[in-house]
Amino acid sequence: MERLRRTMMFVPGANAAMLRDAPLFGADSIMFDLEDSVSLKEKDTSRALVHFALKTFDYSSVETVVRVNGFDSCGALDIEAVVLAGVNVIRLPKTETAQDIIDVEAVIERVERENSIEVGRTRMMAAIESAEGVLNAREIAKASKRLIGIALGAEDYVTNMKTRRYPDGQELFFARSMILHAARAAGIAAIDTVYSDVNNTEGFQNEVRMIKQLGFDGKSVINPRQIPLVNEIYTPTKKEIDHAKQVIWAIREAESKGSGVISLNGKMVDKPIVERAERVIALATAAGVLSEEDI
């Protein structure tokens, strides 16, 4: 079954209550943050807290992600702690080159081997947050088989570009396009950046519709209120599901007749239409709005 990554919810690593309650939020992925949301004096405590949470609480209903610090800080300690605790994905901040991925993977693999953990169990995600990273997105996306996705980090990116965030998001168009194309070429997920104005519901929904139209798999979120809004937009509608089912039935009918020609309502059905229908079915099934018996 396809892994849903419609929503990736940031949870501050220093917030014990949110760590405990994270599975209740309804996000597809929960990202415990040990980087920007944690002050220097709280780094060690937060690392221990996230390790404890991963070992203690039941996160089986969600994908667990930890955003670690860079190697210029305490990144190696973060990686070791969360790999030992069984995290699903490590998110690298401020990734600029493929070598950044290779360096982090080496630490992950060392920890896995030294502790008899299945090598390759811990996956990776790269956050791209600078002009250098955007221009190297293709190489970054193909740097490791552990990579499940790349994500845009807009706040650092716009600062690096000597601009700021605007409501229409035009300042992010090139970065989004580069990251999306790199992800698709590598066969991994593309996750959009956060929308920081949690009180602007209309603006948030418009941005989610736009990034879905571009082709992103999902969006990072910073407030539980944003989760159902994203999930609803990214979940196939009844109309989309019904059309996809008709395409699948048309394929089966053609196969039963031994025909290589597929038609629906008098129109030819070509490979891209079939692939889109199969993806709609996969997403709807993963989201729980369609059962295999209904197909």
Model-identified regions with their sequence ranges:
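Expand to "…catalyze enediolate/carbanion chemistry for C-C bond making/breaking, isomerization
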Residues: M1-I295
